[in-house]
Protein backbone atom coordinates (compact mmCIF):
# COMPACT_ATOMS: atom_id res chain seq x y z
CA UNK A 1 0.00 0.00 0.00
CA UNK A 2 2.78 2.39 0.95
CA UNK A 3 4.63 1.49 -2.26
CA UNK A 4 1.47 2.24 -4.26
CA UNK A 5 1.10 5.62 -2.59
CA UNK A 6 4.73 6.52 -3.33
CA UNK A 7 4.25 5.41 -6.94
CA UNK A 8 1.18 7.63 -7.30
CA UNK A 9 3.02 10.58 -5.73
CA UNK A 10 5.99 10.07 -8.03
CA UNK A 11 3.68 9.90 -11.07
CA UNK A 12 1.88 13.07 -9.99
CA UNK A 13 5.13 14.96 -9.46
CA UNK A 14 6.50 13.77 -12.80
CA UNK A 15 3.27 14.76 -14.56
CA UNK A 16 3.28 18.17 -12.86
CA UNK A 17 6.93 18.65 -13.82
CA UNK A 18 6.16 17.81 -17.44
CA UNK A 19 3.38 20.40 -17.44
CA UNK A 20 5.35 23.11 -15.64
CA UNK A 21 8.65 22.73 -17.48
CA UNK A 22 7.47 24.29 -20.77
CA UNK A 23 6.12 27.33 -18.91
CA UNK A 24 9.28 27.73 -16.87
CA UNK A 25 11.30 27.33 -20.04
CA UNK A 26 9.08 29.85 -21.82
CA UNK A 27 9.72 32.39 -19.07
CA UNK A 28 13.45 31.79 -19.50
CA UNK A 29 13.17 32.21 -23.27
CA UNK A 30 11.42 35.52 -22.73
CA UNK A 31 13.97 36.75 -20.18
CA UNK A 32 17.01 35.75 -22.22
CA UNK A 33 15.59 37.20 -25.40
CA UNK A 34 14.69 40.57 -23.95
CA UNK A 35 18.09 40.85 -22.28
CA UNK A 36 20.04 40.16 -25.46
CA UNK A 37 17.77 41.50 -28.25
CA UNK A 38 19.64 39.13 -30.52
CA UNK A 39 17.11 39.25 -33.36
CA UNK A 40 17.86 42.92 -34.00
CA UNK A 41 21.61 42.22 -34.16
CA UNK A 42 20.94 39.52 -36.73
CA UNK A 43 18.71 41.87 -38.72
CA UNK A 44 21.40 44.54 -38.73
CA UNK A 45 23.80 42.06 -40.32
CA UNK A 46 21.29 40.77 -42.86
CA UNK A 47 20.12 44.17 -44.05
CA UNK A 48 23.72 45.33 -44.40
CA UNK A 49 23.95 42.84 -47.30
CA UNK A 50 21.38 44.93 -49.15
CA UNK A 51 18.41 43.79 -51.27
CA UNK A 52 18.06 40.02 -51.77
CA UNK A 53 15.97 39.45 -54.88
CA UNK A 54 16.02 35.91 -56.28
CA UNK A 55 18.89 35.38 -58.69
CA UNK A 56 20.86 38.36 -57.39
CA UNK A 57 24.32 38.52 -55.84
CA UNK A 58 22.66 39.88 -52.70
CA UNK A 59 20.61 36.73 -52.30
CA UNK A 60 23.64 34.49 -52.70
CA UNK A 61 25.46 36.47 -49.99
CA UNK A 62 22.41 36.02 -47.76
CA UNK A 63 22.57 32.24 -48.26
CA UNK A 64 26.17 32.16 -47.02
CA UNK A 65 25.23 34.40 -44.11
CA UNK A 66 22.16 32.36 -43.18
CA UNK A 67 24.07 29.08 -43.15
CA UNK A 68 26.74 30.54 -40.87
CA UNK A 69 24.21 32.05 -38.48
CA UNK A 70 22.31 28.78 -38.09
CA UNK A 71 25.59 27.04 -37.28
CA UNK A 72 26.44 29.81 -34.80
CA UNK A 73 23.00 29.38 -33.23
CA UNK A 74 23.93 25.81 -32.33
CA UNK A 75 21.89 23.80 -34.82
CA UNK A 76 22.78 20.10 -34.83
CA UNK A 77 22.91 20.13 -38.62
CA UNK A 78 22.71 22.80 -41.32
CA UNK A 79 22.40 22.27 -45.07
CA UNK A 80 21.37 23.85 -48.34
CA UNK A 81 18.63 22.65 -50.66
CA UNK A 82 19.04 23.43 -54.36
CA UNK A 83 16.22 25.42 -55.97
CA UNK A 84 15.85 26.77 -59.51
CA UNK A 85 14.59 30.35 -59.25
CA UNK A 86 13.49 33.09 -61.67
CA UNK A 87 15.91 35.92 -62.44
CA UNK A 88 14.31 39.28 -63.12
CA UNK A 89 16.37 42.47 -63.23
CA UNK A 90 14.85 45.91 -62.70
CA UNK A 91 17.39 47.94 -64.68
CA UNK A 92 18.35 51.57 -64.11
CA UNK A 93 15.54 53.39 -65.89
CA UNK A 94 12.14 53.86 -64.22
CA UNK A 95 10.62 57.09 -65.38
CA UNK A 96 7.15 58.47 -65.96
CA UNK A 97 5.52 61.83 -66.58
CA UNK A 98 1.98 63.06 -67.07
CA UNK A 99 1.25 65.49 -69.93
CA UNK A 100 -1.77 67.80 -70.09
CA UNK A 101 -2.22 70.93 -72.16
CA UNK A 102 1.26 72.40 -72.54
CA UNK A 103 2.39 71.12 -69.16
CA UNK A 104 4.01 67.96 -67.89
CA UNK A 105 4.83 66.73 -64.40
CA UNK A 106 6.89 63.77 -63.17
CA UNK A 107 5.22 60.74 -61.61
CA UNK A 108 6.92 58.48 -59.09
CA UNK A 109 6.78 54.90 -60.39
CA UNK A 110 8.63 51.60 -60.24
CA UNK A 111 8.37 48.50 -62.38
CA UNK A 112 6.32 45.64 -61.01
CA UNK A 113 8.31 42.46 -60.48
CA UNK A 114 8.33 40.36 -63.63
CA UNK A 115 7.35 43.18 -65.98
CA UNK A 116 8.80 43.47 -69.45
CA UNK A 117 10.51 46.69 -70.54
CA UNK A 118 9.00 49.47 -72.59
CA UNK A 119 10.57 50.26 -75.97
CA UNK A 120 13.94 52.01 -75.50
CA UNK A 121 12.40 55.40 -76.26
CA UNK A 122 9.57 54.71 -73.84
CA UNK A 123 5.88 54.77 -74.67
CA UNK A 124 3.25 57.47 -74.43
CA UNK A 125 -0.51 57.15 -74.59
CA UNK A 126 -3.80 58.40 -73.24
CA UNK A 127 -4.79 57.10 -69.83
CA UNK A 128 -8.05 55.56 -68.69
CA UNK A 129 -8.70 55.17 -64.96
CA UNK A 130 -10.55 52.09 -63.69
CA UNK A 131 -11.18 50.47 -60.34
CA UNK A 132 -11.96 46.89 -61.39
CA UNK A 133 -11.43 44.30 -64.10
CA UNK A 134 -15.12 44.59 -64.97
CA UNK A 135 -14.60 48.25 -65.85
CA UNK A 136 -11.66 47.31 -68.08
CA UNK A 137 -13.71 44.79 -70.02
CA UNK A 138 -16.61 47.22 -70.35
CA UNK A 139 -14.26 49.59 -72.18
CA UNK A 140 -13.85 47.16 -75.06
CA UNK A 141 -12.14 48.86 -78.03
CA UNK A 142 -11.83 52.13 -76.07
CA UNK A 143 -8.94 50.50 -74.19
CA UNK A 144 -7.00 49.70 -77.35
CA UNK A 145 -3.69 51.59 -77.50
CA UNK A 146 -4.27 53.15 -74.07
CA UNK A 147 -2.57 52.96 -70.69
CA UNK A 148 -4.95 51.50 -68.12
CA UNK A 149 -4.63 53.06 -64.67
CA UNK A 150 -5.87 50.80 -61.85
CA UNK A 151 -6.70 53.06 -58.92
CA UNK A 152 -8.69 51.02 -56.40
CA UNK A 153 -7.36 51.93 -52.93
CA UNK A 154 -7.32 49.85 -49.77
CA UNK A 155 -10.57 49.75 -47.83
CA UNK A 156 -9.55 52.13 -45.05
CA UNK A 157 -12.46 51.02 -42.86
CA UNK A 158 -11.00 47.52 -42.53
CA UNK A 159 -9.07 47.26 -39.26
CA UNK A 160 -7.28 44.15 -40.60
CA UNK A 161 -4.95 45.83 -43.07
CA UNK A 162 -3.89 42.49 -44.54
CA UNK A 163 -7.48 41.91 -45.60
CA UNK A 164 -7.57 45.36 -47.20
CA UNK A 165 -4.42 44.42 -49.11
CA UNK A 166 -6.07 41.20 -50.22
CA UNK A 167 -9.01 43.20 -51.53
CA UNK A 168 -6.83 45.37 -53.76
CA UNK A 169 -3.83 43.28 -54.80
CA UNK A 170 -5.44 41.53 -57.78
CA UNK A 171 -4.96 44.81 -59.69
CA UNK A 172 -1.21 44.40 -59.30
CA UNK A 173 -1.09 40.66 -59.88
CA UNK A 174 -3.39 40.32 -62.89
CA UNK A 175 -3.99 43.86 -64.10
CA UNK A 176 -1.62 43.58 -67.06
CA UNK A 177 -3.35 40.41 -68.27
CA UNK A 178 -6.86 41.85 -68.08
CA UNK A 179 -5.87 45.17 -69.68
CA UNK A 180 -3.96 43.47 -72.49
CA UNK A 181 -7.03 41.40 -73.35
CA UNK A 182 -8.69 44.67 -74.41
CA UNK A 183 -5.67 45.94 -76.35
CA UNK A 184 -4.04 48.22 -73.74
CA UNK A 185 -0.32 48.88 -74.19
CA UNK A 186 0.69 49.33 -70.51
CA UNK A 187 -0.72 49.50 -66.99
CA UNK A 188 -0.15 51.74 -64.01
CA UNK A 189 -1.28 50.35 -60.66
CA UNK A 190 -1.87 52.30 -57.47
CA UNK A 191 0.69 51.18 -54.87
CA UNK A 192 -0.54 48.61 -52.37
CA UNK A 193 -0.44 50.79 -49.26
CA UNK A 194 -2.55 53.05 -47.06
CA UNK A 195 0.34 55.50 -46.73
CA UNK A 196 -0.06 58.73 -48.65
CA UNK A 197 3.45 59.48 -49.88
CA UNK A 198 5.47 59.63 -53.07
CA UNK A 199 7.14 56.21 -52.69
CA UNK A 200 6.00 53.50 -55.14
CA UNK A 201 5.62 49.92 -53.90
CA UNK A 202 6.66 47.06 -56.16
CA UNK A 203 5.41 43.47 -56.05
CA UNK A 204 4.83 40.47 -58.23
CA UNK A 205 2.72 40.64 -61.39
CA UNK A 206 1.82 37.86 -63.82
CA UNK A 207 1.53 37.24 -67.53
CA UNK A 208 -0.60 34.73 -69.41
CA UNK A 209 1.15 33.16 -72.38
CA UNK A 210 -2.05 33.39 -74.43
CA UNK A 211 -2.31 37.17 -73.88
CA UNK A 212 0.13 39.84 -75.16
CA UNK A 213 2.65 40.99 -72.54
CA UNK A 214 2.57 44.68 -71.70
CA UNK A 215 4.73 46.74 -69.29
CA UNK A 216 3.42 47.20 -65.75
CA UNK A 217 4.43 49.74 -63.12
CA UNK A 218 3.31 50.81 -59.67
CA UNK A 219 2.62 54.48 -59.06
CA UNK A 220 2.93 56.15 -55.65
CA UNK A 221 -0.29 57.04 -53.86
CA UNK A 222 0.45 60.76 -54.20
CA UNK A 223 1.09 60.21 -57.90
CA UNK A 224 -2.09 58.18 -58.23
CA UNK A 225 -4.16 60.90 -56.57
CA UNK A 226 -2.56 63.55 -58.80
CA UNK A 227 -3.21 61.57 -61.97
CA UNK A 228 -6.79 60.84 -60.95
CA UNK A 229 -7.45 64.55 -60.31
CA UNK A 230 -5.96 65.53 -63.66
CA UNK A 231 -8.10 63.00 -65.51
CA UNK A 232 -11.19 64.60 -63.96
CA UNK A 233 -10.12 68.19 -64.74
CA UNK A 234 -8.16 68.04 -67.99
CA UNK A 235 -8.71 66.71 -71.50
CA UNK A 236 -6.33 64.53 -73.51
CA UNK A 237 -4.19 63.54 -70.55
CA UNK A 238 -1.30 61.29 -71.58
CA UNK A 239 1.42 59.50 -69.65
CA UNK A 240 4.91 58.65 -70.83
CA UNK A 241 6.63 55.61 -69.28
CA UNK A 242 10.16 54.24 -69.64
CA UNK A 243 11.29 50.93 -68.08
CA UNK A 244 14.32 48.79 -68.90
CA UNK A 245 13.68 45.66 -66.82
CA UNK A 246 14.66 42.21 -68.10
CA UNK A 247 13.52 38.64 -67.62
CA UNK A 248 16.63 36.44 -67.65
CA UNK A 249 16.97 32.63 -67.61
CA UNK A 250 16.34 30.81 -64.32
CA UNK A 251 19.35 30.32 -62.03
CA UNK A 252 20.31 27.85 -59.32
CA UNK A 253 19.79 29.02 -55.77
CA UNK A 254 19.13 27.57 -52.32
CA UNK A 255 16.87 27.15 -49.33
CA UNK A 256 18.88 27.31 -46.08
CA UNK A 257 17.90 24.70 -43.48
CA UNK A 258 19.03 23.98 -39.92
CA UNK A 259 17.59 21.98 -37.04
CA UNK A 260 17.71 21.03 -33.39
CA UNK A 261 17.23 17.27 -33.46
CA UNK A 262 14.49 15.72 -31.32
CA UNK A 263 15.42 12.92 -28.93
CA UNK A 264 12.32 10.70 -28.83
CA UNK A 265 10.55 11.49 -32.11
CA UNK A 266 13.19 13.01 -34.40
CA UNK A 267 11.18 12.37 -37.58
CA UNK A 268 8.31 14.50 -36.30
CA UNK A 269 9.15 18.04 -37.39
CA UNK A 270 8.08 21.40 -35.99
CA UNK A 271 9.12 23.84 -38.70
CA UNK A 272 9.65 27.55 -38.21
CA UNK A 273 10.27 29.49 -41.40
CA UNK A 274 10.63 32.79 -43.20
CA UNK A 275 11.73 33.80 -46.67
CA UNK A 276 15.30 34.90 -47.19
CA UNK A 277 14.67 36.80 -50.42
CA UNK A 278 13.37 40.35 -50.61
CA UNK A 279 12.38 42.83 -53.25
CA UNK A 280 15.09 45.10 -54.60
CA UNK A 281 13.64 48.27 -53.10
CA UNK A 282 14.92 48.98 -49.60
CA UNK A 283 16.68 46.18 -47.73
CA UNK A 284 13.72 43.96 -46.86
CA UNK A 285 13.92 44.72 -43.15
CA UNK A 286 10.30 43.92 -42.33
CA UNK A 287 9.67 41.76 -45.43
CA UNK A 288 11.09 39.37 -44.53
CA UNK A 289 14.39 40.10 -42.83
CA UNK A 290 12.47 40.34 -39.58
CA UNK A 291 11.13 36.80 -39.97
CA UNK A 292 14.56 35.42 -40.86
CA UNK A 293 16.14 37.05 -37.82
CA UNK A 294 13.32 35.82 -35.58
CA UNK A 295 13.66 32.21 -36.74
CA UNK A 296 17.42 32.11 -36.18
CA UNK A 297 17.05 33.83 -32.83
CA UNK A 298 14.32 31.38 -31.80
CA UNK A 299 16.52 28.30 -32.28
CA UNK A 300 19.43 30.11 -30.64
CA UNK A 301 17.30 30.76 -27.54
CA UNK A 302 16.10 27.14 -27.48
CA UNK A 303 19.67 25.89 -27.76
CA UNK A 304 20.85 28.14 -24.93
CA UNK A 305 18.38 26.47 -22.56
CA UNK A 306 19.95 23.10 -23.41
CA UNK A 307 16.54 21.42 -23.52
CA UNK A 308 16.03 17.83 -24.61
CA UNK A 309 13.44 18.33 -27.32
CA UNK A 310 11.02 15.48 -27.90
CA UNK A 311 10.55 16.41 -31.56
CA UNK A 312 12.82 18.14 -34.07
CA UNK A 313 12.61 21.92 -34.40
CA UNK A 314 13.70 22.91 -37.90
CA UNK A 315 14.33 26.33 -39.42
CA UNK A 316 13.81 26.81 -43.15
CA UNK A 317 14.86 30.07 -44.79
CA UNK A 318 12.95 29.84 -48.06
CA UNK A 319 14.15 31.06 -51.44
CA UNK A 320 11.97 32.98 -53.89
CA UNK A 321 8.82 33.69 -51.93
CA UNK A 322 8.42 37.13 -53.46
CA UNK A 323 8.19 36.16 -57.11
CA UNK A 324 7.45 32.48 -57.39
CA UNK A 325 7.36 30.41 -54.16
CA UNK A 326 9.90 28.09 -55.78
CA UNK A 327 11.70 27.47 -52.48
CA UNK A 328 8.54 26.43 -50.65
CA UNK A 329 7.42 24.19 -53.48
CA UNK A 330 10.83 22.50 -53.69
CA UNK A 331 10.84 21.90 -49.94
CA UNK A 332 7.36 20.38 -50.04
CA UNK A 333 8.43 18.04 -52.84
CA UNK A 334 11.45 16.60 -51.01
CA UNK A 335 11.74 12.81 -50.94
CA UNK A 336 12.39 13.04 -47.20
CA UNK A 337 8.78 14.10 -46.71
CA UNK A 338 7.83 10.45 -47.27
CA UNK A 339 9.70 9.58 -44.06
CA UNK A 340 9.41 12.73 -41.98
CA UNK A 341 6.14 14.07 -40.66
CA UNK A 342 5.73 17.81 -40.32
CA UNK A 343 3.24 18.10 -37.49
CA UNK A 344 3.37 21.91 -37.51
CA UNK A 345 4.84 24.66 -39.68
CA UNK A 346 5.06 28.19 -38.29
CA UNK A 347 5.86 31.17 -40.50
CA UNK A 348 6.87 34.74 -39.77
CA UNK A 349 6.23 36.94 -42.80
CA UNK A 350 4.19 39.89 -41.62
CA UNK A 351 6.85 42.26 -40.32
CA UNK A 352 8.71 42.67 -37.06
CA UNK A 353 6.05 44.54 -35.13
CA UNK A 354 4.53 43.79 -31.72
CA UNK A 355 3.22 40.19 -31.90
CA UNK A 356 -0.47 39.68 -31.14
CA UNK A 357 -0.86 35.95 -31.75
CA UNK A 358 -1.06 33.37 -34.51
CA UNK A 359 -3.49 32.49 -37.27
CA UNK A 360 -3.89 28.76 -37.89
CA UNK A 361 -4.81 26.84 -41.03
CA UNK A 362 -6.25 23.52 -39.89
CA UNK A 363 -9.46 21.62 -39.22
CA UNK A 364 -11.69 22.42 -36.26
CA UNK A 365 -10.57 19.39 -34.24
CA UNK A 366 -6.90 20.35 -34.46
CA UNK A 367 -7.76 23.99 -33.75
CA UNK A 368 -9.31 22.99 -30.43
CA UNK A 369 -5.99 21.34 -29.50
CA UNK A 370 -4.01 24.35 -30.66
CA UNK A 371 -5.98 26.82 -28.54
CA UNK A 372 -4.41 25.40 -25.36
CA UNK A 373 -1.15 27.11 -26.34
CA UNK A 374 -2.67 30.56 -25.84
CA UNK A 375 -1.92 30.40 -22.12
CA UNK A 376 1.82 29.85 -22.52
CA UNK A 377 1.94 32.40 -25.37
CA UNK A 378 0.60 35.05 -23.01
CA UNK A 379 4.19 35.22 -21.72
CA UNK A 380 5.14 37.10 -24.90
CA UNK A 381 1.73 38.80 -25.30
CA UNK A 382 1.06 36.71 -28.43
CA UNK A 383 -1.92 34.74 -27.14
CA UNK A 384 -4.57 35.59 -29.75
CA UNK A 385 -5.01 32.32 -31.67
CA UNK A 386 -7.55 32.32 -34.48
CA UNK A 387 -8.54 30.32 -37.54
CA UNK A 388 -6.97 31.85 -40.64
CA UNK A 389 -4.19 31.26 -43.11
CA UNK A 390 -0.72 29.93 -42.55
CA UNK A 391 2.05 31.76 -44.35
CA UNK A 392 2.49 31.48 -48.12
CA UNK A 393 5.59 29.29 -47.79
CA UNK A 394 4.42 26.87 -45.09
CA UNK A 395 1.00 26.50 -46.71
CA UNK A 396 2.71 24.26 -49.28
CA UNK A 397 2.90 21.64 -46.50
CA UNK A 398 -0.82 21.74 -45.71
CA UNK A 399 -1.48 18.95 -48.22
CA UNK A 400 0.40 16.59 -45.89
CA UNK A 401 -1.95 17.37 -43.01
CA UNK A 402 0.51 19.79 -41.43
CA UNK A 403 -1.04 22.35 -39.09
CA UNK A 404 0.15 25.69 -40.51
CA UNK A 405 0.60 28.83 -38.40
CA UNK A 406 1.48 32.43 -39.17
CA UNK A 407 2.76 34.90 -36.60
CA UNK A 408 0.35 37.84 -36.48
CA UNK A 409 1.99 41.10 -35.39
CA UNK A 410 0.20 44.42 -35.23
CA UNK A 411 -0.52 45.15 -38.90
CA UNK A 412 -1.24 48.87 -39.03
CA UNK A 413 2.18 50.03 -40.27
CA UNK A 414 3.35 47.01 -42.27
CA UNK A 415 2.06 48.13 -45.66
CA UNK A 416 3.53 51.61 -45.17
CA UNK A 417 6.91 49.96 -45.84
CA UNK A 418 6.05 46.74 -47.69
CA UNK A 419 7.86 46.23 -51.04
CA UNK A 420 9.25 49.77 -51.04
CA UNK A 421 12.45 51.72 -50.48
CA UNK A 422 11.04 52.56 -47.04
CA UNK A 423 11.53 48.96 -45.84
CA UNK A 424 14.73 49.61 -43.90
CA UNK A 425 15.96 48.72 -40.42
CA UNK A 426 15.24 52.13 -38.90
CA UNK A 427 11.54 51.16 -39.11
CA UNK A 428 12.07 48.13 -36.83
CA UNK A 429 11.81 48.29 -33.02
CA UNK A 430 14.28 45.89 -31.32
CA UNK A 431 11.92 44.81 -28.52
CA UNK A 432 8.96 44.24 -30.80
CA UNK A 433 11.16 42.20 -33.12
CA UNK A 434 12.52 40.13 -30.23
CA UNK A 435 9.06 39.42 -28.85
CA UNK A 436 8.23 37.85 -32.21
CA UNK A 437 11.30 35.62 -31.96
CA UNK A 438 10.36 34.66 -28.41
CA UNK A 439 6.83 33.82 -29.55
CA UNK A 440 8.19 31.52 -32.26
CA UNK A 441 10.47 29.85 -29.72
CA UNK A 442 7.67 29.35 -27.18
CA UNK A 443 5.19 27.92 -29.68
CA UNK A 444 7.73 25.62 -31.32
CA UNK A 445 8.86 24.39 -27.89
CA UNK A 446 5.29 23.75 -26.75
CA UNK A 447 4.48 21.75 -29.88
CA UNK A 448 7.81 19.91 -29.87
CA UNK A 449 7.20 18.73 -26.31
CA UNK A 450 3.44 18.17 -26.39
CA UNK A 451 2.52 17.54 -30.03
CA UNK A 452 -0.82 18.59 -31.48
Where do the PLM segments sit?
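Acidic/histidine-rich catalytic neighborhood of metal-dependent amide-processing enzymes
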Residues: 195, 252-255, 278-370, 452
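Soluble metallo-hydrolase cores and metallopeptidase-like ectodomains found primarily
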Residues: 23-25, 99-101, 109-141, 205-285, ...
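Second-shell loop/turn segments in exported
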Residues: 26-33, 48-57, 125-129, 160-176, ...
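Active-site-adjacent substrate-binding region
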Residues: 180, 186, 190-191, 209, ...
